[in-house]
């Protein structure tokens, strides 16, 4: 197999380089798929044809974005896509071309795009009442909070609604500090928790951290079985956490926030045994365990919650993304005792618990149960992971295949022994796969990990097509 000879420094990656890696492909690695007609696989049949698109072209939209929207916004792919329609696990561009969506709006559209059993109740609600404020009674927020609490273990029964994962994590961190009377928060390197003040502090990647005050956050070693200093030894990483608390704090902390699988960080599974050992350490230090389920929640990993695979029960659970299938919705769920801290002052969120969003949330829970999407995520995810692992044996550029359910990562390296990030090659393969009709995400500190987080209605036929497109694209490097 071809071994990619390019060597890149893995000590650091500048923000400007990282942004270029996200939004465009380098000249050296960029090429159109001139021979895509050689690709024999075809998208699985799908009984939906979108109506003709009559809106502005991609060029017009791109021009408006550049003129009127923040320069911090960027697009995937060398030639940005104008997506105008979606149905279940497929997206359609302005020409009507169908794409297999293996990114789901960044792990958001768990039920599938425009799922009729989500759309219909939302339309009915929005026709009747859009936003009454939670200062009045309305059944939508009450019904959803009851259903959501039933999905969580133990005394995790009190729900606070927000509009995003960042908001949810900000609230959780504040509650932990109020409840314990401590200020120190412990997080994990390479984790991502949001882009506001406290969550930016908890995030463990420099490219997401602006030069603003970020107090009292300590970052433990990342328990990454592939790149971590202790490999798969969860106990050694847990000992590092213990030492960090003992020597870097007063010995007492407010809380520990952690993803069950790191999403933005590159679909990194935690080393076996780490989270349960970390839980014990945190409790001994008087802290609360905050489970960040923004990406791994709502059946994506084959468990309903990612933390369930680690045999721990958190004190606070945060969620967003898949909770609303695309509607702006997030939540914090905790115990009645911890929830009581917010009665010390006035706490309010204008749009948190909006009747349309919570109607969507309840519909999502119903669809997941009715269509057995959790079981499908486990079954199809296991099948896809096996296929990707087989692909690793064929292509030297694949350094690691990881994840659970339909939250999978494929890390690309130019040298397996040195684990040199194949960042440019990752972009090139993504672009080729797009030309073949497959959309995937990317992440990881070096931008060299494919993030495969499709809608949970993804089928084995879809998985086969994705793998064939990836195989073909890699073979053309």
Curated annotation (Swiss-Prot):
SUPFAM superfamilies: PLP-dependent transferases (SSF53383). PANTHER family: ALANINE--GLYOXYLATE AMINOTRANSFERASE 2-LIKE, PTHR45688. This is Alanine--glyoxylate aminotransferase 2 homolog 2, mitochondrial. It comes from Arabidopsis thaliana (Mouse-ear cress). Residues 1-22 form a transit peptide. Its cofactor is pyridoxal 5'-phosphate. The modification N6-(pyridoxal phosphate)lysine is found at residue 321. CDD domains: OAT_like. The gene is AGT3. Belongs to the class-III pyridoxal-phosphate-dependent aminotransferase family.
